[in-house]
């Protein structure tokens, strides 16, 4: 019997299954929960429980995603699985489900297919740092040479997208066979393969750096003046820790960042000596005038982030049914880019040979925005027209 409550003492890691349609992502997810449930590390979830993924909205975009959780001896995992290919594209681009690592499911019987390639490309573009391969349906392949061939193909494909193809663990097995058996034993022919997979995930995907250990950053949501005390910027601390007396910078919307010192931290009308990632705070800033800071800028640890105006982005364009545009857009399209808390107008350059982009498409674009924004690779944004979301994107590389 699984413990009702997960102990939160173990390090937490976010993973997800990716891969071509019908290669067995959901079946394998169900098999992981069943096998681990035998060791008290999960509540077994049936295929159809996972498959009927609830719809969620992220940045105005509807995505169907299933979340399961489980634990191994060393870690607690949150695992996402999506029913449809479009859901994966949207999920990865919006960052609705940030992945510290992915389990790439490839059918041994079919080898890599078009969506296998697309998901690897997406993982590279949106910054999924590690991939472990589950070579599913291994029960359907009798020829060891064929298995070897498929494995080579997968390694080449991973290397092509700058993943370390030669080092990535590839674990053969069968989600379906493990589900049908369900004994959960490490010695079992099929359940043991699921344990092999989890051991690889445990050892190959590193524990991510916690948000509090990263350099301080807080998007400015609002600014006001407290008579006799100075200017206060409010917002939710995105990462890191801010202590009273820290030197920080105001970054974005101006050419050069502006240095200041945080002279007070307030939360729920109480004064604190520090705040950390996740806290909603007001930060009192020394020598900053009300007009020197505005929504859309960020407060950040000095030197940790710079303002930029030109970047490439991986973008998903909403379909008409999702409330997006009804018509395609062309080169020099000028929407607003919504970064963190503000809209900035920009101009879009399409890749060579792309005439236009249809609603529902995924595309890599180059953008130039009219005001600099504190930006780094992996930053998510929405594309809007007059306040209506028509696309979602992620910064892939910064040009200037």
UniProtKB/Swiss-Prot annotation:
Residues 174-176 are annotated as: G5. Its EC number is 3.6.5.3. It is found in: Cytoplasm. Residues 136-139 are annotated as: G4. It catalyses: GTP + H2O = GDP + phosphate + H(+). Residues 60-64 are annotated as: G2. Residues 10-209 form the tr-type G domain. Keywords: Cytoplasm, Elongation factor, GTP-binding, Hydrolase, Magnesium, Metal-binding, Nucleotide-binding, Protein biosynthesis. Its main location: cytoplasm. GTP binds at residues 19-26, 81-85, 136-139. Mg(2+) binds at residue 26. Pfam families: GTP_EFTU, GTP_EFTU_D2, GTP_EFTU_D3. Residues 19-26 are annotated as: G1. One of its GO terms (cellular component) is cytosol. One of its GO terms (molecular function) is GTPase activity. The keyword Acyltransferase does not apply. The keyword Ribonucleoprotein does not apply. Monomer. GTP hydrolase that promotes the GTP-dependent binding of aminoacyl-tRNA to the A-site of ribosomes during protein biosynthesis. This is Elongation factor Tu. The lineage of its organism: Bacteria, Bacillati, Bacillota, Clostridia, Eubacteriales.
């Amino acid at each position: 019997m699984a413990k009702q409550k997960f102990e939160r003492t173990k390090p937490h890691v976010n993973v997800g299954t990716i891969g071509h349609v019908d290669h067995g992502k959901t079946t394998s997810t169900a098999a992981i929960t069943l096998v681990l449930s035998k060791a008290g590390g999960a509540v077994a979830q049936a295929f159809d429980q996972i498959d009927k993924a609830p719809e969620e909205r992220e940045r105005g975009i509807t995505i169907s995603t299933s979340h399961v959780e489980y634990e191994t001896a060393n870690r607690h995992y949150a695992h996402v699985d999506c029913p449809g290919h479009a859901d994966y594209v949207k999920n990865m681009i919006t960052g609705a489900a940030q992945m510290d690592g992915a389990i790439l499911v490839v059918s041994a019987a079919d080898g890599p297919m078009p969506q296998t390639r697309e998901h690897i490309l997406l993982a590279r573009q949106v910054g999924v740092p590690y991939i472990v391969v589950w070579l599913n349906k291994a029960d359907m392949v009798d020829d060891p040479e064929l298995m070897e061939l498929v494995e080579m193909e997968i390694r080449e494909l991973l290397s092509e997208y700058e993943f370390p193809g030669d080092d990535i663990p590839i674990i053969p097995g069968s989600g379906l066979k493990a589900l049908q058996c369900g004994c959960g034993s490490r010695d079992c022919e099929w359940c043991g393969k699921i344990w092999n997979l989890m051991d690889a995930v445990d050892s190959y995907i590193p524990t991510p750096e916690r948000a509090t250990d990263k350099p301080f950053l807080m998007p400015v949501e609002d600014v006001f003046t407290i008579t006799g005390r100075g200017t206060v910027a409010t917002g939710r601390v995105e990462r890191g820790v801010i202590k009273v007396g820290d030197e920080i910078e105001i970054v974005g919307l101006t050419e050069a960042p502006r240095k200041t010192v945080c002279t007070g931290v307030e939360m729920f009308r109480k004064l604190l000596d520090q705040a950390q990632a996740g806290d909603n705070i007001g930060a009192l800033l020394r020598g900053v005038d009300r007009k020197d800071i505005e929504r859309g800028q960020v407060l950040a640890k000095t030197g940790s982030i710079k303002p930029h105006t030109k970047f490439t982005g991986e973008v998903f364009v909403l379909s008409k049914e999702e409330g997006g545009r009804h018509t395609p857009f062309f080169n020099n399209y000028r929407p607003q880019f919504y970064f963190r808390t503000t809209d900035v107008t920009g101009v879009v350059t399409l890749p060579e040979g792309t005439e236009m982009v249809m609603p529902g498409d995924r595309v890599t674009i180059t953008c130039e925005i009219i005001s600099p924004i504190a930006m780094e690779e992996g930053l998510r944004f929405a594309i809007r027209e007059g306040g209506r979301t028509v696309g979602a994107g992620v910064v892939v590389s910064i040009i200037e």
